[in-house]
Regions:
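Short, surface-exposed amphipathic charged segments that create phosphate/polyanion-binding patches used
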Residues: 1, 64-68, 93, 149-154, ...
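Conserved N-terminal catalytic core of the sugar/cofactor nucleotidyltransferase
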Residues: 1-30, 35-37
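A generic secondary-structure signal
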Residues: 9-13, 41, 55, 126
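Conserved core of the sugar-phosphate nucleotidyltransferase
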Residues: 18, 32-102
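Hydrophobic/aromatic beta-strand patches that form the interior of the parallel beta-sheet core
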Residues: 23-25, 50-52, 134-136, 143
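Short histidine/acidic/glycine/proline-rich micro-motifs that form metal-
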Residues: 28-29, 57-58, 141-142
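Flexible, glycine/proline-enriched loop segments at strand-loop-helix junctions
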Residues: 24-32, 93-94, 107-114
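Left-handed beta-helix
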Residues: 102, 110-197
């Protein structure tokens, strides 16, 4: 499903909610975001949409959205999967967005009525001038997991104490507990520079 189709499927649920805000987040990124800071920024800017970005190196093989913004943080350019040669640094959207709940419901309803199919292309990119879209620049550690290569790379980064401290040090993180069999190491196994749970 596309993001727009997924949102259309949950409009009934969103309509019954009383919360003022909706935070959309994909599961392919690792960061320790303080959502209260992002929500405060969203309110301060009186934004329709707040997109969280991270300044990072990108490669031509990556699937990503590059965001350009003015000095106030208002998004004025969106490039979906831009063509680049080699590697470049850019403000990359990390698949976290904040909306006012009722605004999101209206946006999805209007988009479906107009036959829009892509949230990024039909809503974000085409409506930059009519919507108040702001960028929240996240400056902490972020790991985008887009391939086996990036999965391995970011797992190796966790061996760095500074990275672990940034992700796990300041605030508690709660996850679903899954009791499963532990790792098993044979008599001839050699393990170095590893974190084992």
């Amino acid at each position: 499903k596309t993001r727009l189709e997924a949102l259309k499927a949950v409009t009934g649920f969103l309509a019954r909610r009383q919360e003022n805000y909706v935070v959309l987040s994909d599961c392919d990124g690792v960061a320790h975001l303080d959502l209260s800071e992002i929500l405060d920024y969203h309110e301060e800017k009186n934004a329709d949409i707040t997109m969280v970005t991270h300044y990072e190196e990108v490669e031509k093989t990556s699937n990503y959205m590059v965001i350009g913004a003015d000095k106030e943080g208002r998004v004025n350019e969106v490039r979906v999967n831009p063509r680049i040669r080699g590697k470049a640094k850019a403000d990359v959207y990390i698949n976290v967005m904040v909306f006012n709940r009722q605004f999101l419901l209206n946006l999805v309803e209007d988009s479906v009525a107009h036959g829009d199919t892509s949230f990024e292309n039909d809503i974000i990119a085409k409506q930059l001038n009519s919507l108040k879209i702001y960028r929240y620049d996240f400056r902490g550690y972020y790991a985008g997991i887009h391939s086996m290569t990036t999965y391995y790379k970011h797992n190796m980064e966790l061996l760095d104490k500074a990275v672990r401290d940034e992700l796990f040090g300041a605030r508690d993180i709660y996850t679903k507990v899954r009791d499963s069999a532990p790792s098993k190491y044979g008599e001839e196994a050699t393990v170095r520079n590893s974190l084992i749970s």
